Amino acid sequence: KHYNKKANNFKEYSDMNMRYLRISGILQRKGRGMIIVPAKHILAEKLAKSTSNEEPIMVQYKRLCEGAELPTDNMDTAKALLNDLIKQMKGRQILFNINDLPLNTAAEINIARRRLENILSQTDEIQYAKEQCNQWQEIADYMELLIKGGGKRTYDDDNVIEVPKDETPAYLEWILWRASLAIDHMVNKPYEVRGFKLDSDFLPVSAAGGGKGDLYCEFNDFTILTEVTMSTSSRQEAMEGEPVRRHVSD
């Protein structure tokens, strides 16, 4: 009643907080809520147990600024996380090999775990790519939202798609990536096509960095290199045309 700021602040700040949680890789979307990523259950439990303490707030703040310890710095916890991940991957019949890696310290165990997490992530992304040919309507709906400069579309109580207005460049790259996967017949892997990072829900974290093309699609007889821009000015070709030629030559 007496709030003198924009009413949208309540929604926008909550959306940003949810996004930060997803970027952590520990939580993912489920309907309108969030759940713990199955592969990160033990880590989430350890983090939850380690956050409550009686230290003064300034002591906690100083430790965070200097680099707070993580549960995975403990060797027993690191082993438990690695063993849990191995169990999950065997249950899903995903091939892996870490026999060449030493497992004598927490740091070495975490290196092995990150290798497995990368294999698991790539496996999930390949499966996600295979599903895109059946997601053409959602892809088209995202494109319509991008044409409007962002917004939201509600299918039902548990299914809502959204393009944040300040993230349209990242979402344009992302939806063109999905459209390319839907066309299929590419010979390179889906994670080799994109130049941007994804969160655990396969949503874009940010736009692609510099130094290479936004999308790099390899087919049997040809390659398509895509540079994405939301610009509509007369300088659009100057901004994106030159980088494409340079990336092709590289």
Spans of model-derived segments:
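Catalytic core segments in nucleotide and nucleic-acid processing enzymes
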Residues: 102, 108-109, 115-250
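Short helix-coil junctions and helix-kink-helix linkers
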Residues: 2-11
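Short amphipathic alpha-helical surface micro-motifs
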Residues: 9-10, 18, 207-209
